């Protein structure tokens, strides 16, 4: 089992999760495949990806796969709840993107409207960044 140093901070009514930079997506993926009792061949075959690409992902030579492929991976792995968020967070960090689960959730137009109603655009446009300070 991969041990990941996670630190939670409670500030201004919200939890902030800090992920230890030493853990990589490729390490987590390898551990999750092992925990699911899948062989590498069975995993990449079921996923429909080529062997060289899979081993490039597993070695960390390439960035984690795109969001749709991440979701397909998780369907095969049947992960624990805490592994799901870590999986998406690590992939997003290495891809320099918003985590796939959050990006998919933001496809809900009603939720986007609610989020935008909560944004202080004056602060955002003035400072160039926005930190929710509730």
Model-derived segments and spans:
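Short alpha-helical "recognition helix" segments of helix-turn-helix
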Residues: 40-45
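Short, charged recognition helix plus adjacent turn
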Residues: 85-120
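C-terminal regulatory/oligomerization modules of transcriptional regulators
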Residues: 112-134
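A short, Lys/Arg-rich alpha-helix, primarily the initiator
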Residues: 2-38, 125-130
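Residues within the alpha-helical elements of helix-turn-helix
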Residues: 35, 46, 76
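Recognition helix of helix-turn-helix/homeodomain-like DNA-binding domains
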Residues: 48-64, 90
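DNA major-groove recognition helix of helix-turn-helix/homeodomain DNA-binding modules
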Residues: 67-85
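DNA major-groove recognition helix of helix-turn-helix
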Residues: 33, 58, 69
